[in-house]
Design a protein with these regions (language model features):
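Non-transmembrane "mature" sequence context
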Residues: 1-111
Length: 111
């Protein structure tokens, strides 16, 4: 799942610093994980990865053109008081990722 998240970060145009924050990892640990030295992924890390993959899945359902979904992540959004989904997720808490996922699930009729 971590490799899928790395690919997702590339598609979204997320920096390593941002990716580490989304995963709640320090920069050194993130860099080590990128080389394949994952170590143990805790419950919070698994939940973060699951939410990120869920966000990606919802965007693929909502947008026929994947590129539009990738752009949506960084676009201002009224649902988030004019902030982008990425800005919300970079709040750093697991609940920030969950907020974006719940919004997308509701938009696609998933819940």
């Amino acid at each position: 799942m971590f490799r899928a998240a790395l690919n997702l970060f590339r598609l979204w145009g997320v920096s390593d610093v941002q990716a580490a924050k989304l995963l709640d990892l320090n920069g050194r640990t993130y860099a080590r994980w990128k080389t394949g030295d994952l170590g143990r992924i805790g419950r919070d890390g698994k939940a973060r990865l699951s939410n990120l993959i869920g966000i990606h899945k919802a965007l693929r359902i909502l947008f026929r053109d994947p590129g539009r979904g990738y752009l949506w992540i960084k676009a201002p959004n009224d649902a988030f008081d004019g902030e982008s989904a990425l800005a919300v997720m970079l709040g750093g808490d697991l609940t920030d990722l969950m907020r974006v996922r719940r919004y997308l699930d509701a938009e696609r009729g998933g819940w």
